[in-house]
Amino acid sequence: MKYQEWLSEWLENYVKPSSKPKTYTRYAQIVESHLLPRLGGYELDELTPQLLQHQIVDMGKCGNKRTCKGLAPSTVNLIVAVIQESLETAYSIELTKVYSADKIKRPRIEEKKVECFSVAEQKVLEEALKNDKRPKTFGILLCLYTGLRIGELLALEWTDIDFDKREISISKTCHDSRDELGRYVRFVNPPKTSTSMRVIPIPKQLMPLLRETKKKNDSRYVVGNGERIISVRSYQRTYELILKKHGLPHRGFHALRHTFATRALECGMDVKTLSEILGHKNPTVTLNRYAHSLMDHKRDMMNRLGKLFI
């Protein structure tokens, strides 16, 4: 059996029934864009470790068909995962004599530096959002003070907020993806991990603004458009326009979450509590991601200690 035939069967009968739509769509895109053109014509038993490794290295050098530039290591690693999953399934049902994809060497991914807003930039952004007063833009402020991901924010309904207890319950997230006809649609699903399903306390200073926003908003969603969820791309654009209007540096929406975490550590919040609020798998993930913030905090504490004696 040729790899292209198996990939089609694998996607339809193995991935689709057991995966979220987002995962299936992403896998299908990888198969269509990268695996079929390069490996689809080979028989399954012709996919040797040497051949697979050669193709993976080549994707890192010139895998983008449009620009002829290399693909990002994270993208290449996802392609490797699809190759390995598809061939492991083929081996398990005896379509191939050996499983060779486990010998692929993955590209190393450099840890990206966490981007966040400085205290001065945060003050400018907060003031801009408070003066804006649109229910739609209040969500940006909410992320800045709770660490919500953009998908969690857009899927958030007013019924998820307990005004008496000052708590937000996170039980779903939304994302934009293509359906089987190639159209962009919005999917709402439970979070990927159980730790992402969590309850977040709301800072009491935010409650008056939250109540005011609810009075002006007739949508079931906190930042929605009537009964419809705002698309991720549309909301990112709203956020980018606010940054541009107020002379703030361009930073991705996730910088709001990083800013929340950084400020929380600077204020002395313990890592375990922060990890639970962010919905991380465990505190080690939080420590690894925000080690630089902890070091800055440690340095400040040591300087304060030095002032007592020197």
Residue ranges and their predicted role:
Residues 103, 119, 155-212:
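Conserved tyrosine-mediated DNA breakage-rejoining catalytic core shared by Y-recombinases
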Residues 174, 207, 278-303:
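Catalytic-site neighborhood detector that most strongly recognizes the C-terminal catalytic loop/helix
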Residues 29, 120, 179, 203-249:
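Active-site/catalytic core of tyrosine-dependent DNA strand-transfer enzymes
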Residues 69-73, 77-79, 92-98, 102-156, ...:
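Basic, Lys/Arg- and aromatic-enriched nucleic-acid-binding interface segment
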